[in-house]
């Protein structure tokens, strides 16, 4: 389907080191990529259909950890360490549930980190609800992150729902929207650090 075309384009044409896919269905990495890429798929807690899952693919062998968010939504996040940076991906609950999902993941992310996925809320909706994306206090600093967005709609609804939160210690090079492919309702977003 379209997910396979997008995935293959990101791996071969764009040469992405890490690819995050949400709602990937019964995902299996094709034989053409075996040996070069490794992946992990996790279902959301309470999910009863094959769409409710998240996948992360990387061009190196890795051990991923799965985080069940303490946000009341039952969502899961996958983390892998790539060259010293902890990369998390998730598919947030729609609407106000996204705030709890993101807040919990930023709070527990191990620095330096990148969080990316289908946030199901626009950056302004999240930042309005979260004010400044930080955790902790003056005497006990927590994590802080900034939004890395392409500034364009990433969903066929015309809203920007797919973007990244980046540890404040990391520097963004680019964040761009890829081209849309038939069958999917989201555009791929490509981040370079």
What does each of the following model-derived ranges do?
Residues 2-3, 7-8, 49-193:
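Active-site regions of metal-assisted phosphoester/phosphodiester hydrolases
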Residues 24-28, 44-47, 90:
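Short active-site-proximal "capping" loops at secondary-structure junctions
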């Amino acid at each position: 389907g379209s997910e396979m075309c997008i995935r293959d384009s990101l791996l071969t044409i764009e040469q992405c080191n890490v690819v995050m896919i949400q709602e990937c269905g019964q995902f299996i990495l094709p034989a053409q990529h075996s040996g070069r890429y490794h992946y992990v798929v996790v279902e959301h807690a309470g999910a009863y259909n094959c769409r409710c899952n998240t996948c992360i693919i990387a061009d190196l062998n890795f051990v991923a950890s799965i985080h069940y968010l303490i946000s009341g939504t039952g969502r899961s996040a996958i983390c892998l360490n790539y060259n010293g940076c902890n990369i998390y991906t998730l598919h947030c609950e729609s609407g106000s549930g996204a705030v709890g999902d993101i807040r919990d993941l930023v709070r527990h992310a191990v620095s330096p980190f990148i969080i990316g996925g289908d946030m199901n809320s626009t950056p302004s909706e999240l930042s309005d609800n979260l004010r400044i994306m930080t955790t902790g206090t003056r005497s006990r600093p927590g994590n802080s992150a900034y939004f890395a967005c392409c500034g364009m709609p990433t969903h066929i609804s015309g809203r920007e729902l797919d973007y990244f939160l980046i540890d404040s210690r990391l520097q963004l090079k680019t964040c761009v929207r890829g081209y849309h492919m038939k069958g999917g309702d989201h555009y791929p977003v490509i981040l370079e650090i």
